[in-house]
Amino acid sequence: MWRVPRRLCVQSVKTSKLSGPWSRPAAHMSTLLIHHPQYAWLQDLGLREDNEGVYNGSWGGRGEVITTYCPANNEPIARVRQASLKDYEETIGKAKKAWNIWADIPAPKRGEIVRKIGDAFREKIQLLGRLVSLEMGKILVEGIGEVQEYVDVCDYAAGLSRMIGGPTLPSERPGHALIEMWNPLGLVGIITAFNFPVAVFGWNNAIALITGNVCLWKGAPTTSLVSVAVTKIIAQVLEDNLLPGAICSLVCGGADIGTTMARDERVNLLSFTGSTQVGKEVALMVQERFGKSLLELGGNNAIIAFEDADLSLVVPSVLFAAVGTAGQRCTTVRRLFLHESIHNEVVDRLRSAYSQIRVGNPWDPNILYGPLHTKQAVSMFVRAVEEAKKQGGTVVYGGKVMDHPGNYVEPTIVTGLAHDAPIVHQETFAPILYVFKFQDEEEVFEWNNEVKQGLSSSIFTKDLGRIFRWLGPKGSDCGIVNVNIPTSGAEIGGAFGGEKHTGGGRESGSDAWKQYMRRSTCTINYSTSLPLAQGIKFQ
């Protein structure tokens, strides 16, 4: 994702002009963007003015009607009817029935279906990427790259479907076998956030399906059109293969639906992606019923650059990790620790790089930086910048709301704060980078670990010993621990997730498939004798 030639970064943030329909005054716009000829392609994704937000083999919805908006100009796109609690109950029932069919299909055959789902997304990658850009606000190359992640994880899951399983273990008893069996949990509930409305669902959905589960998805209300379009693509694949649509169900909705999922004992695993505050509430509700949860929550990620760091790697890495998706990734770098000997030079280089970021219409292939997702996010940005100033910080770049239609703010660099300032320890989902000086390895490793979250981290150094100390027990306490690359851009082949208040869950690659299955330890006696534990003998 975000592979854009450096030559395109030529227009200043502060002098950029937004052009095209994204920046037209409201007087020039009709009621809904979907009515405009330039958005006719939305119909190729099965979208229309009014969309049903419930799918369980058929489309419906009896809940509230909401309108989704384009963050680049805050114009309405289309409407979606959400799920009612009655819709939810019906969908759960149909999903449970669909599981009886899906679980009986051999894992490699399930993998073939998932591969076909990936192929279907590959065919729609440009259209769906444009929709992600339109409704979420990220630049087009990121929107397309996000859909590519779904394609990639489907390819990965298809191969994995032929490899999942447990070991055969040596038994202490003659004539006995000791094996591990892995079976599906049943119904996996998936609640995703606005910032990756396709990819995070894909990480969960593809792996959950090949492990024999059915899925119930609630996406973010503000990206409901993406949820509907994604589900339509999957539903067509299931229909073409004569399978129940309720294998992959959708219930668009708000907190009432999310709370119901968290409390529902029929939801065998609930995967939740969102804020730490809401995630804690979800975890408590699931734990209260002794259920399983998979949490991907906040991140207060750091990059550390030592005196021997290659600055030609550091500067673009920080730029990518700090302003990509306008600072709205869970892996966005929010803290930058620079050795005192290189601090001033790196800050100067970053200010120069920031001044060349091209801002504007997210569909323009030259653009590298789009809007925040909502007006509320803009307000949080403003409050965070003001609070940073009050706590002793100096804004050396940006810090203001941009005078353009839409939710645009300047990418911002703040220096001069204490490493443990309250605002630094608070995750603000916006492009604000706090920069600090450090003197030695021990103190900066401690600073990296002192925040409550533990998602992603990276150091830049050529010192081999330092690298392995960073990876070791006294190094980073994060789930993602990088060297000489950004905090963002995780590959699907590795397990994605973090520690501490990030939630502890793991998704996507490696052995994350185990999260979606239950393990049974099985002892099989194939002899004619019965050796009992502790040598007990019944006469």
Curated annotation (Swiss-Prot):
Annotated tissue distribution: Present in liver, kidney, brain and pancreas, and at lower levels in jejunum, duodenum, stomach and testes (at protein level).
Presequence positions on this chain: 1-26
Site feature: Transition state stabilizer: N195
EC class (word): oxidoreductase
Positions bearing N6-acetyllysine: K86, K94, K97, K462, K500
Membership in a protein family: Belongs to the aldehyde dehydrogenase family.
Name of this chain's protein: Alpha-aminoadipic semialdehyde dehydrogenase
PANTHER family per UniProt: ALPHA-AMINOADIPIC SEMIALDEHYDE DEHYDROGENASE
GO BP terms in the entry: glycine betaine biosynthetic process from choline
UniProt entry tagged with the keyword Signal: no
CC terms in the record's Gene Ontology section: cytosol; mitochondrion; nucleus
Keywords, in A-Z order: Acetylation, Cytoplasm, Mitochondrion, NAD, Nucleus, Oxidoreductase, Transit peptide
Catalytic residues, chain numbering: E296, C330
EC number, UniProt record: 1.2.1.31, 1.2.1.3, 1.2.1.8
Substrates-to-products reaction catalysed: nonanal + NAD(+) + H2O = nonanoate + NADH + 2 H(+); (S)-2-amino-6-oxohexanoate + NAD(+) + H2O = L-2-aminoadipate + NADH + 2 H(+); betaine aldehyde + NAD(+) + H2O = glycine betaine + NADH + 2 H(+); an aldehyde + NAD(+) + H2O = a carboxylate + NADH + 2 H(+)
Binding locations of NAD(+): 192-194, 218, 258-259, 274-279, 296-297, 427
Organism of this sequence: Mus musculus (Mouse)
Pathway(s) annotated for this protein in UniProt: Amine and polyamine biosynthesis; betaine biosynthesis via choline pathway; betaine from betaine aldehyde: step 1/1
Pfam families: Aldedh
Annotated InterPro entries: Ald_DH/histidinol_DH (IPR016161), Ald_DH_C (IPR016163), Ald_DH_CS_GLU (IPR029510), Ald_DH_N (IPR016162), Aldehyde_DH_dom (IPR015590), ALDH7A1-like (IPR044638)
Functional summary from the UniProt entry: Multifunctional enzyme mediating important protective effects. Metabolizes betaine aldehyde to betaine, an important cellular osmolyte and methyl donor. Protects cells from oxidative stress by metabolizing a number of lipid peroxidation-derived aldehydes. Involved in lysine catabolism.
